[in-house]
UniProtKB/Swiss-Prot annotation:
Lineage: Eukaryota, Metazoa, Chordata, Craniata, Vertebrata
Start-end of Low complexity biased regions: 131-158
Record text on subunit structure and interactions: Binds DNA as a homodimer or a heterodimer. Can form a heterodimer with DBP.
Gene Ontology molecular function: DNA-binding transcription factor activity; double-stranded DNA binding; sequence-specific double-stranded DNA binding
GO CC annotation terms, alphabetical: nucleus
Species of the source: Mus musculus (Mouse)
Subcellular location: Nucleus
Record field: compositional bias (Basic and acidic residues): 39-59
Gene3D superfamilies on file: 1.20.5.170
Protein name: Thyrotroph embryonic factor
Additional information: Mice deficient for all three PAR bZIP proteins (DBP, HLF and TEF) display a dramatically shortened life span and are highly susceptible to generalized spontaneous and audiogenic epilepsies (due for example to the noise of a vacuum cleaner) that are frequently lethal. The down-regulation of pyridoxal kinase (Pdxk) expression in these mice may participate in this seizure phenotype.
Region (Basic motif): 233-253
């Protein structure tokens, strides 16, 4: 055909449309890609296989070493935290772990009842151990002991309170002072009751009434009795009065002797206590000087 100018038009090339040949080529490429990926996964390259095998061997060696160390210290509970997995970027693999196998491998009982049965000892064994050893050890409990600082603080406070408590008063009669006192045996005999125990000036205590001054008894006026009136009744009365007077004189002399010997012992004891107190005061003075020097050098206590 020719246009209005009389020239010829150039031939138009046909455009490639979605024909059957192009669609078949694209379908072949998409179908071959999964096959290649599958072959690569089934048969990986040699380098990656060697790296995986090295990582597995290293992991097995670490597990065997940890198992040997745990077998040695099985009685002390194996330190699970010391068992590490090497990580070098490529040989780290997450695997499925069974809890029962993990507990069995580390020597930990699976059930808590089994744990309590293993920890508690039989009664016969405990009694045998207590009789054999002087120090009795308490059986281990299944629960772990928790440290509580409040208990220690309360125990220290109670001990300090016990130390600060004033001691109970001491009976002076129970205190014995080492005094060099050796009285005359004759004086001891005169100070003792006839037929009784020997007088002990170290332990004898007088009542307050005994130490009070005795009242003066006025003597009765003498009555002159002629010889004609001195009958048996007179002489019996006279003998009774003489016996009573002798008894009172003996009791008074006995008490006087006892008081004298007791006073001599107390004087000796007093001098011994005074010397002891003087020595204690000297020692306290030395301690005070030491404390004052310490305070001047290091500050108050």
């Amino acid at each position: 055909m020719s246009d209005a100018g009389g020239g010829k038009k150039p031939p138009v090339e046909p455009q490639a449309g979605p024909g059957p040949g192009r669609a078949a080529g694209e379908r072949g490429l998409s179908g071959s890609f999964p096959l290649v990926l599958k072959k690569l996964m089934e048969n990986p390259p040699r380098e990656t296989r060697l790296d995986k095998e090295k990582g597995k061997e290293k992991l097995e060696e670490d597990e065997s070493a940890a198992a040997s160390t745990m077998a040695v210290s099985a009685s002390l509970m194996p330190p699970i935290w010391d068992k590490t997995i090497p990580y070098d970027g490529e040989s780290f693999h997450l695997e499925y772990m069974d809890l029962d196998e993990f507990l069995l491998e580390n020597g930990i009982p699976a059930s808590p009842t089994h744990l309590a049965q293993n920890l508690l000892l039989p009664v016969a064994e405990l009694e045998g151990k207590e009789s054999a050893s002087s120090s009795t050890a308490s059986p281990p409990s299944s629960s772990t002991a928790i440290f509580q600082p409040s208990e220690t603080v309360s125990s220290t406070e109670s001990s300090l309170e016990k130390e600060r408590e004033t001691p109970s008063p001491i009976d002076p009669s129970c205190v014995e002072v080492d005094v060099n006192f050796n009285p005359d045996p004759a004086d001891l005999v005169l100070s003792s009751v006839p037929g009784g125990e020997l007088f002990n000036p170290r332990k004898h205590r007088f009542a307050e009434e005994d130490l009070k001054p005795q009242p003066m008894i006025k003597k009765a006026k003498k009555v002159f009795v002629p010889d004609e009136q001195k009958d048996e009744k007179y002489w019996t009365r006279r003998k009774k009065n003489n016996v009573a007077a002798k008894r009172s004189r003996d009791a008074r002399r006995l008490k006087e002797n006892q008081i004298t010997i007791r006073a001599a012992f107390l004087e000796k004891e007093n001098t011994a206590l005074r010397t002891e107190v003087a020595e204690l005061r000297k020692e306290v003075g030395k301690c005070k000087t030491i404390v004052s020097k310490y305070e001047t050098k290091y500050g108050p206590l």
